[in-house]
């Protein structure tokens, strides 16, 4: 783990650039983190300053004005917002049920495994049978549970801010490509547009990857236990859990009840995001409006004692 904050490096003795010469194109720390992420997913990885940055760079490098993206319904709200911002450049967006095949006549298929916050899993086999490139946002699954490139996907995307870095202190995104030529083209695009990751968050990512599997498996065990207990609670109407990972969502009666629950916890932090060592929950209507049920609460389970988390949830649910 090397933390090199330099922005320039000297040329060689012949006056030619070495592997690292200007930080907009490559840095030792970012390159080390990319190698590690690529090993985990089985492809060629590139880092970006955020998940949204990774999404924008990948889409803009692959598509042209007039092209259409098929986006999984109920996907992460931020992804739909990013794509909406790109529509002014002539890109079109259609949403589809990712548990079935994508629509025809699209130039890119975008899946989530599982979706956030509805926790549906895509039909990868149906998607990769389609001729358009397939991107799988595997932020929630992580390479611990799913390596989409092994199932025929062309690209994997991670908001590395979440589980990969895992400590709520590093903002990063990652794209992993099955094809090294496609990764090289994206690397050129990244350098030309300046959508580049810095050394410090890349170093924090390297730190987080050391404990990735331990964290993710512990979070998944605790989330499974909490999902089971939530299903038996009288104030909870619906529980969504994919059977792995530390993310789940559940519905209470309405938006007012959801606000009382989210502000009623003491151990679980009322905050956004997911995948960190600290458990957080929030009412998602705050951001997503009528895209989600009014009473939907998203819970990202951290590394705390699951019985203590349940006691905290029970106390908050008494206010629902």
What are the functions of these language-model segments?
Residues 242-297, 301:
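Conserved C-terminal alpha-helix-loop-beta "cap" of PLP-dependent enzymes
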Residues 1-4, 175:
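Short conserved active-site loop signatures built around small residues
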Residues 101, 255-260, 305-311:
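Short, conserved charged micro-motifs
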Residues 186, 259-266, 312-317:
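Short amphipathic alpha-helices in soluble, non-transmembrane regions
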Residues 85, 93-95, 215, 279-320:
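PLP-dependent enzyme catalytic core of the Aspartate aminotransferase-like
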Residues 44-235, 240:
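Conserved PLP-enzyme active-site core in the AAT-like
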Residues 2, 8-57, 61, 74-85:
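Conserved N-terminal alpha-helix of the aminotransferase class I/II PLP-enzyme fold
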Residues 2, 223-224, 240-249:
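Conserved glycine-rich beta-strand-loop-beta hairpin in the small C-terminal domain of fold type I
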């Amino acid at each position: 783990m090397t933390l090199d904050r330099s922005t320039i490096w000297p040329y060689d003795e012949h006056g030619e650039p070495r592997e690292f010469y200007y930080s907009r194109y490559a840095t030792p720390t970012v390159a080390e983190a990319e190698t590690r992420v690529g090993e985990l997913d089985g492809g060629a990885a590139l880092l970006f300053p955020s998940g949204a940055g990774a999404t924008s760079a990948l889409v803009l490098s692959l598509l042209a004005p007039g092209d259409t993206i098929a986006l999984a319904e109920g996907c992460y709200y931020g992804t739909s917002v990013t794509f909406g911002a790109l529509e002014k450049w002539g890109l079109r967006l259609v949403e589809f049920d990712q548990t079935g095949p994508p629509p025809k006549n699209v130039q890119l298929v975008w899946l989530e495994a599982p979706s956030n916050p509805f926790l549906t899993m895509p039909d990868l086999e149906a998607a990769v049978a389609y001729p358009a490139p397939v991107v799988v946002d595997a932020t929630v699954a992580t390479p611990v549970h799913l390596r989409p490139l092994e199932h025929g996907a062309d690209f994997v995307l991670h908001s590395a801010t979440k589980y990969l870095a895992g400590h709520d202190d590093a903002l990063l995104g990652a794209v992993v490509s099955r094809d090294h030529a496609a990764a090289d083209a994206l690397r050129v695009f990244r350098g030309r547009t300046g959508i580049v990751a810095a050394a410090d968050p890349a170093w924090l990512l390297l730190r987080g990857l050391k404990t990735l599997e331990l964290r993710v498996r512990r979070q998944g065990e605790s989330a499974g236990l909490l999902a089971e207990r939530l299903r038996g609670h009288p104030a909870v109407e619906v529980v969504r859990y994919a059977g792995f990972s530390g993310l789940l969502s559940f519905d209470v009666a309405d938006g007012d009840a959801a606000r009382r629950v989210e502000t009623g916890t003491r151990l679980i932090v009322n905050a956004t995001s997911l995948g960190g060592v600290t458990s957080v929950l929030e009412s998602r209507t705050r951001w997503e409006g009528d895209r989600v049920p009014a009473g939907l609460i998203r819970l990202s389970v951290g590394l705390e004692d699951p019985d203590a988390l349940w006691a905290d949830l029970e106390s908050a649910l008494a206010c629902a």
